Every structure is written in C-alpha cells, then in structure tokens.
C-alpha cells in the first residue's frame, strides 16, 4: 500500500489497527499496544448501544480514524443526505483524525449493492467525482481521504487509478486549507495495490 501524503502538516499517527466487534472484549480487558484505531463508520451510526459505548472508552485513550464503505462517491444517485448526517454526527462526537471512504460506487436508483464497484477513469467520471467530493467536504466541513484500489478500475478508463486519482485531487483542490474548514488537514490519498 502506498500512502501519498499531499500535506506536510498532517501528523503521523503511528501504527493503528481496525476496531471490530469481535475485538471489543479484548479492547476492554487489555489495551493493545497501538497508537490509533480505525472504525468502519457505518458500524457506529446507531444512536446508542454497546458499539458506541466501547468506542467511547477506546477514544478516551487513542485517536480514531473513520473509514466508510457506503458513501458511493462515484454513483450518479444524489448524495445520501441521511448517510452524510449520520457521518457528520459521528465525526463531531469522536473527532477522528481523518475520514476515508472508497473511490467507487455502490448504489444505483437509491439501492445499495453492498459492494464496491469500479469507476471508469474518464473525464466525465472524474468531473463527476470532483463535484461530489467537494459537496461532501462542504457538508462535513472537513476534507476526506479517498481510498483508491487499483483492482477497481472500470472499463473504458482513459487513465490508470494512480493518474486518475491524482487528477481528481488536483481538480478538487484537495490539499488546500480553506476558511470554510479551519483546522482540518488536507486530504491524503490512500492507494491500495
């Protein structure tokens, strides 16, 4: 995995691990030797319950990063306002170091396929994603990390994933500080191979 740091002011968090439900008991009984934890955002959208209680305890000791799997940034459906409201509320509560999701699509006609479908890296798709990234960042009032998987490059692509993602970052002016999002570090692009 290559991490392309587009910002010199993003603090290095050290080594982290994913916090999954099957690990809750261990997290509560012993504190693993890690510097931060990653949570799947959607697993904590509930308004109460054990997952949030565990995350509260973990967050008291460690920074959290949030990684989503359902933003569907590449979909042609309207952005899911309910999803974004839940994500924004969760971020306000736990103040993650960053929020990430996949550069893909997973919904059509307001139905979720529960998969990460590839985007074609074409001018049309890149322009569409840039507009949606900007809209999401405006709603969340913070910049987001896009997770780009080289294995998920759609048919008819005019660019490879690395170049296409780089174009997207440049066009969305990702990496610039904004008066609208004070104090939030610019986007990091995570590329999985």
Question: Which functions belong to the PLM regions below?
Answer:
Residues 2-26:
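Boundary/entry segment of secreted carbohydrate-active catalytic domains
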Residues 13-19, 35-39, 64-67, 97-101, ...:
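Hydrophobic faces of well-ordered beta-strands that scaffold small-molecule active sites
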Residues 20-22, 40-42, 69-72, 102-104, ...:
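Active-site beta-loop-alpha junctions enriched in small/polar residues
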Residues 27-32, 49-66, 82-97, 134-139:
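Acidic (Asp/Glu)-rich catalytic clusters
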Residues 41-53, 72-81:
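Acidic-and-aromatic substrate-binding clefts and catalytic sites of carbohydrate-active enzymes
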Residues 80-146, 152:
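Active-site acidic/histidine proton-transfer and metal-coordination neighborhood
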Residues 148-151, 157-164, 174-181, 185:
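Alpha-helix boundary/capping motif
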Residues 186-192:
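Short, intrinsically disordered C-terminal tails of secreted or membrane-associated proteins
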């Amino acid at each position: 995995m290559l991490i392309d740091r587009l910002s010199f002011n993003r603090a290095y968090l050290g080594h982290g691990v994913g916090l999954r439900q099957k690990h809750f008991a261990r997290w509560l009984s012993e504190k693993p030797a890690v510097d931060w934890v990653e949570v799947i955002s959607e697993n904590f959208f509930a308004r109460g319950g054990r997952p949030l209680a565990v995350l509260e305890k973990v967050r008291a000791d460690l920074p959290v990063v949030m990684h989503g799997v359902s933003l569907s940034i590449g979909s042609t459906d309207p952005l899911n306002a309910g999803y974004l409201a839940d994500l924004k509320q969760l971020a306000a509560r736990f103040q993650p170091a960053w929020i990430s999701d996949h550069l893909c699509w997973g919904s059509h006609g307001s139905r979720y396929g529960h998969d990460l479908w590839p985007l074609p890296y074409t001018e049309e798709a890149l322009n569409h994603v840039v507009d949606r990234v900007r809209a999401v960042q405006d709603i969340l009032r913070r910049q987001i990390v896009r997770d780009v998987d080289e294995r998920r490059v759609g048919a008819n692509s005019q660019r490879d994933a690395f170049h296409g993602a780089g174009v997207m970052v440049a066009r969305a002016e990702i990496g610039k500080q904004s008066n609208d999002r004070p104090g939030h570090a610019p986007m990091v692009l995570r590329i999985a191979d």
